[in-house]
Amino acid sequence: MAVRFLALGLLIFVTSCSGRRVCESQQSCDDEQCDETLNIAIVGAGPSGAYSAYKMRHSGKDVGLFEYCNRVGGRLYTYQLPNTPDVNLELGGMRYITGAHNILQEVTKELGLKSVLFTEGFGRPGRTRYFLRGQSLTHEEVQSGDVPYNLTTIEKLNQGRIYEYYLKELTGFDIGNGSISREQLLKLRVSDGRLLYQLTFDEALDLVASPEGKEFARDVHVFHTEVTSDANAVSVFDDHLGEDGAGDAILTVEEGMQKVPKELIKEFKKTSASNQVQLNKYLQAIRSKSDHSFVLYFRPTSTVDGKTTILDYRPLQRVCARQVILALPVFALRRLDWPPLHEGRAETAYAAVRNMAASKVFMTFDQAWWLDRNFTDNTAFVTKGDTPFSQMYDWKKSNVSGDYILIASYADGNNTLYQKVLRDQGESINGSEPGANRVSEPLKNNILDHLSEAYGVDRSTIPEPKTAVSQFWTDYPFGCGWITWRAGYHFDDVMSTMRRPSLKDEVYVVGADYSWGLMSSWTEGALETADAVLKDYFKGECAKPPSVDHLDSHMA
C-alpha cells in the first residue's frame, strides 16, 4: 500500500512539474505569464546564431541566446583526443576559402584569430589519389590518363574538364578559364527549352553524356550530395565551376574552427550585462500574443557524452520576446511547433531543400602507414573513392605523443547512413571516445577493410588504431551536415520566405541551410544569411555606438 501511495505521489509531482502547457487559444496566450522577458531571442548558438548575437552586442536591448545542447558552435566542432591533445580535430567544418568566404575572413581578423594554411586543400596534385572501380589512380591519371570508364572519344579529350564540357554541351555556355555566377546558372536553358535548375543531375547528363561518362563525372565528384536523387543539376556545376568556390588560399583557424563562434559569443556576453546565453534549452513551441510579441516555450535538456536528451518531466520555461531569430537547421525548424511554419507558403519554401547526412571518423596510429613507401605503393595524403569511406585525409602528427592522425572517413549520403548503422552495432573499439562519438568494431573494420583495398595492402598489415572518434551529422537538431537544393526550385523564389516565413510576424530564420547553392555547405553560408537578415530587419540593433566607431577609425 505504501508503495502505491509513493507511486501516486511521484505521478502528482511529475504532473505538477511538467504541468505547464503550450497555450492554444488567443486568450490563453495573451494571459500567459513569462518567466523572462527579452527584446530579442536568438535560438541556436551555431555560426549564424553566434554571429547574430555578436552583431547586436551594442544594441542596449535585452538579447538572449539559447542553445539546445551544452556546446556552442553548431556544425563547427573542434575536438581533441587524449593522446593527441595538441592537434585540433575538426568534426564539422574544417576550412574556408579566402577571396570567396569574405565575411568569415573578416570575422576571424576582427576577433584576432590566426588563420593558417589548410595543408591538403581539397586534395593537392602529387599528394592525392583516387580509388575508382577497384583501381588506384593518381590525380594526373584521373585528369588525363587511363581510367576504368569507357568514355567516348570526345569525353576522353575533355576528361580533365568534364564538367566544363558537359555544361557547354547542355547550355552552350563556355566558361573558358573563368567561373560562373549564380545569376548566370539560374538563367541557363538546355536544348529543349527547360531551365537547367528544373533538371536533376541524371536528367541533365542523360541529355549529353554517355552512360559511362555520367558515372565518371559522378564518381570523381565523390560527394553524393549533388549527384543523387532529386538534387538540382545547377548544384554540381556550381560546386565545380561557380564563383563561390573561386578564391585564393584554403585556410583554417589555428585555434580550431569552433573558436570562431566561441569568440563571437564571448564578445557578445562581455559587452553588456543585458546580453545573456542559456545552454541546454530545447525550443518546443512559439505562440503569438495580440500585442505582436511572442511566447517561446523551452524545455530543459541534458547532455552526456555528446548525446542530448530532452527532459520531458521538467517544466516548460516561458520566455517572451518582441523579435525572434531562429538560427536553426531546417531539420529542427520543420519540427518546431509554430503554426506559420506549417502553412502552405512556408511548407513549399522549405521543401526546396533536402537534408544530406554527413560524417567523419578520425583514427590515430603509431605510424603513418598511408605515407610509408615500404608499406604501400599507393602512398597519398588524400584518397578519394567510390567506396564507403569516400574520402581520407592525413591529419598531421602530434608533437606530444608522436602519434599520427587520419580522417579515415569523410562521407555523406548513403555512405554516412550505412556507417551509422555500423557505428550502432557491436562493442566500441579500444581507445574509442564514448557516447555519440564512439567508433564500434564493425565501423572500424569496414573503414579499414576498404582503405586496405585502396592502398593495395593486406588488411592484416594495417595496425589497430590507438584512439578514434566519430561524428555523424544525422540527429536532432542538425539532421544533416548540409542541404542540397531540389530540382525545380529557383532560389530567389523561396529565399525570402525561408528567411521570414510569416510576413505578419517578426520571426526570422538564419543559417547555412537557407543559403544559395555551394554556400549551404560552408560556414560562409550561415554568416551570409545572418548578415542579410540583420541588414534588412535589425539595422538599428547592429549599429555600433559612436565611441566604438571613433575608436575604430583610429585603429584602422
Swiss-Prot record:
One example GO MF annotation: L-amino-acid oxidase activity
Tissue and organ expression note: Albumen gland.
The keyword Signal is annotated on this UniProt entry: yes
Source organism, top-level taxon: Eukaryota
Keywords carried by this UniProt record: Antibiotic, Antimicrobial, Glycoprotein, Signal
Description of how the protein assembles with itself and partners: Homotetramer.
Summary of the function given for this chain in its UniProt record: Has antibacterial activity against Gram-negative and Gram-positive bacteria.
Protein name: Aplysianin-A
Organism of derivation: Aplysia kurodai
